[in-house]
Amino acid sequence: MLEAMAEPSPEDPPPTLKPETQPPEKRRRTIEDFNKFCSFVLAYAGYIPPSKGAPDSATLLEKMKLKDSLFDLDGPKVASPLSPTSLTSRPPAALTPVPLSQGDLSQPRKKDRKNRKLGPGGGAGFGVLRRPRPAPGDGEKRSRIKKSKKRKLKKADRGDRLPPPGPPRAPPSDTDSEEEEEEEEEEDDEEETTVVGGGGVPAPVLPTPPEAPRPPVTVHPEGAPPTDSEGKDAGSTETSQDGDGSSSEGEMRVMDEDIMVESGDDSWDLITCYCRKPFAGRPMIECSLCGTWIHLSCAKIKKTNVPDFFYCQKCKELRPEARRLGGLPKSGEP
């Protein structure tokens, strides 16, 4: 019985000792580690100057935080001995960003932007710790202001030259991200390149002047046309030849004329060429001897190379000397 009673006695003290020793040790370690981690993160982010030469002040602040936490937990019993220390410790505790450390860990970039907006002394309990940070923030704001001024000047110059391509954009605010600014700068560069490229576009090449007067000289008959229908044929050929610059373009236009021109005109169905096909709006040339009108395609003549004097196949067979001389026959000859 004595042995049985003596066995539980050594088992009882370990469970009573464990809760007494372990909880305060765990609590102390977690708070210290958390404070060190927060101070490291804040110093790395630039909110707090790195504490290189004053390690004692950091340890004192940690002790003051522990006393404040104990004072809040215990109640009014510990208030009387810790009243002077609590008064002195509360301002630094308010200045320390312990409650904001979780937000800093999750979203450090957003806090950087907020600090740029607020500037030095923007927050109530956060201004003293951000005193070493105002210089880079001011430099960034100044650079942004300079960029916005340059953009406004560029837009004003572009407004004088070109109309606005779309609805007016809102002025850039401080809340815009750096990526948006880079995109806007790229757009500005592209617009400048388009403006410069648009000014250097070459003018469309016009047809050469010597080619234009050739068709009317050759197509128009020297004397009066034999009939009114032939005069109409000459006028139509003149307009078609003046508008065309090459044989391929002339053929396309002839096809268009065949489709578009009405067939009510008398000259449209007139047959004068030895191919026994009507005028049909195609360019023709008059023989210098007999005065008959023949299609250029039937005579194998290009519009760009129309001769001054043309002789049809019949005249060439009957009067070969006219071809050798290259001029009109004498008036006495038939």
From Swiss-Prot:
Zinc finger (PHD-type): 270-318
Entry GO terms, CC: cytoplasm; nucleus
SMART domains on file: PHD (SM00249)
Biased composition (Low complexity): 80-92, 236-249
InterPro entries (UniProt xref): Znf_FYVE_PHD, Znf_PHD, Znf_PHD-finger, Znf_RING/FYVE/PHD
Any one GO molecular function term: zinc ion binding
Residues with PTM Phosphoserine: S57, S80, S83, S246, S247, S248, S331
Localization, UniProt: Nucleus; Cytoplasm
GO biological process: one example: negative regulation of autophagosome maturation
Keywords of the record: Acetylation, Autophagy, Cytoplasm, Metal-binding, Nucleus, Phosphoprotein, Ubl conjugation pathway, Zinc, Zinc-finger
Biased composition annotated in UniProt, kind: Pro residues: 162-171, 204-218
Phosphothreonine carried by residues: T96
Gene3D superfamilies cross-referenced by the UniProt entry: Zinc/RING finger domain, C3HC4 (zinc finger)
Origin superkingdom: Eukaryota
Subunit structure: Interacts with LRSAM1.
Domain notes: The PHD-type zinc-finger domain is required for interaction with LRSAM1 and negative regulation of autophagy.
Summary of the function given for this chain in its UniProt record: Acts as a negative regulator of autophagy, through promoting ubiquitination and degradation of LRSAM1, an E3 ubiquitin ligase that promotes autophagy in response to starvation or infecting bacteria.
Family the entry assigns: Belongs to the PHF23 family.
Protein name as annotated: PHD finger protein 23
Organism: Rattus norvegicus
Lineage: Eukaryota, Metazoa, Chordata, Craniata, Vertebrata
